Amino acid sequence: EEDRKCPKILMRCKRDSDCLAKCTCQESGYCG
């Protein structure tokens, strides 16, 4: 089930697909 959540890792992104699992790319430029 862990892969269904957004891991609390600070990752830079330009789009949702840059992020892990259920993370989405926030306006701040980081996954969340």
Swiss-Prot record:
Instruction: Answer whether the UniProt record assigns the keyword Secreted to this protein.
Output: yes
Which terms are listed as keywords in the entry? Answer: Disulfide bond, Knottin, Protease inhibitor, Secreted, Serine protease inhibitor
- One MF term in GO for this entry? serine-type endopeptidase inhibitor activity
Q: Which PROSITE patterns match?
A: SQUASH_INHIBITOR (PS00286)
Subcellular localization, as worded in the UniProt entry? Secreted
Q: Which Pfam families match?
A: Squash
Q: Does the keyword Disulfide bond apply?
A: yes
S-S pairs: 6-23, 13-25, 19-31
The written remark on domains in the entry is: The presence of a 'disulfide through disulfide knot' structurally defines this protein as a knottin.
* Function according to Swiss-Prot or TrEMBL: Inhibits trypsin.
Put simply, this protein is called Trypsin inhibitor 2b
Organism of derivation: Sechium edule
